[in-house]
Regions:
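Short consensus segments that form the blades of beta-propeller domains
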Residues: 5-10, 101-106, 144-148
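Residue-level detector of short, conserved catalytic/binding motifs and their immediate flanks
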Residues: 12-16, 112, 156
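Start-of-domain signal
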Residues: 1-13, 122
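Extracytoplasmic/secreted envelope proteins and their assembly/folding machinery
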Residues: 15, 51, 55-58, 130, ...
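A short beta-strand signature
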Residues: 10-24
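Residue-level recognition of well-ordered beta-strand positions that form the cores
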Residues: 17-21, 113-115, 172
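A beta-strand/beta-hairpin structural motif
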Residues: 22-108, 112, 126
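Extracellular calcium-associated, cysteine-rich motifs in secreted modular proteins
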Residues: 118-178
């Protein structure tokens, strides 16, 4: 497939528009939306990123097959981009710690509708290993001690020297293009 059609993983970046609503009793309330495409780094580079339920849902979709750079910082995407909705239980959303001032109550389920224009495979530390492959225990959480091979307090996906030997990982790996 075309690289523009990349299907993002939990460790990647996406360019999208979205609408987020929380479900409170029998009605929904808008808490966030954008009509202009924005870029989300799913894991973030600190305690951030997007909620697990959102990146899990987005990872089932592909971006457009192509786009045109308008030269002014905007893009026109082919009309075959991913369109979807994700219904997120509170345990995969904000659970009991809703963002202050968001209007989201603790334990509210969420609904996101979105248009996924582009998925971008990330290598956050530039070591030649895609970030999703640096999740050593396979649990889709990159900030854990289990994902810090050399125990230096920096998770592998942000550590350009994963094994702590003083030699950058990019200089140690061998890529087979077979």
């Amino acid at each position: 497939g075309n690289e523009n059609e990349y299907q993002p993983t939990f460790a990647d970046r996406a360019i999208l528009t979205y609408r987020g609503e929380n479900i409170d009793s029998l009605s929904t309330h808008l808490f966030d939306e954008t009509t202009v495409p924005v870029s989300f780094d799913f894991p973030g580079t600190g305690n951030g990123g997007v909620i697990p339920g959102f990146h899990e849902g987005l990872s089932e979709f592909r971006g457009a097959s192509g786009y045109t750079d308008n030269g002014d910082g905007t893009y026109n995407y082919n009309d075959d981009y991913g369109i979807g909705a994700v219904f997120i239980p509170s345990g995969l959303g904000y659970f009991s710690t809703s963002p202050s001032g968001s209007g989201i109550n603790p334990y509210d389920p969420l609904i996101f509708t979105f248009q996924l224009y582009r998925g971008i495979q990330m290598d956050h530390d530039g070591d030649g290993i895609p970030s999703y492959l640096e999740d050593l225990d396979g649990d889709k959480i990159l900030f854990e001690q289990d994902d810090d091979f050399d125990g230096d307090g920096v998770p592998n996906y942000l550590d350009p020297d994963d094994d702590g030997d003083g030699v950058p990982t990019a200089d140690e790996i061998e890529v087979n293009d077979a």
